[in-house]
């Protein structure tokens, strides 16, 4: 029985130590040629055959800033115009709000200055 216990004891510790046995991964050393390609380099290499097919729809010419370019600046322009319209409508709303406030204040001021107004008569009685 002691030999059985000893065998079980040794086997369990052998398996238990295997849990903590960490295999080290191979480290990639910088400078050696690898198969890794960075996404930012695709399409900018000298060979265009290595570029993916979806990249061919983008032009790499110098006429990007020209108005006839196929670059999507038209979308940007329309977005900026829409933003300008929103800003102008906000400005118009602010102006109308200011005008409404002026009307309200002028009507309240006229009520305060009106001698037939109940406020004016009450305040004059209190002061007199």
Curated annotation (Swiss-Prot):
<feature type="compositionally biased region" description="Basic and acidic residues">
    <location>
        <begin position="87"/>
        <end position="97"/>
    </location>
</feature>
<dbReference type="InterPro" id="IPR036936">
    <property type="entry name" value="CRIB_dom_sf"/>
</dbReference>
<keyword id="KW-0341">Growth regulation</keyword>
<dbReference type="InterPro" id="IPR000095">
    <property type="entry name" value="CRIB_dom"/>
</dbReference>
<feature type="domain" description="CRIB">
    <location>
        <begin position="30"/>
        <end position="43"/>
    </location>
</feature>
<keyword id="KW-0472">Membrane</keyword>
<dbReference type="GO" id="GO:0005886">
    <property type="term" value="C:plasma membrane"/>
</dbReference>
<feature type="region of interest" description="Disordered">
    <location>
        <begin position="84"/>
        <end position="107"/>
    </location>
</feature>
<comment type="subunit">
    <text>Interacts with ARAC11/ROP1.</text>
</comment>
<comment type="function">
    <text>Functions as a downstream effector of Rho-related GTP binding proteins of the 'Rho of Plants' (ROPs) family. Participates in the propagation of ROP GTPase signals in specific cellular responses. Is involved in pollen tube growth regulation through its interaction with ARAC11/ROP1.</text>
</comment>
<keyword id="KW-1003">Cell membrane</keyword>
<protein>
    <recommendedName>
        <fullName>CRIB domain-containing protein RIC9</fullName>
    </recommendedName>
</protein>
<dbReference type="Pfam" id="PF00786">
    <property type="entry name" value="PBD"/>
</dbReference>
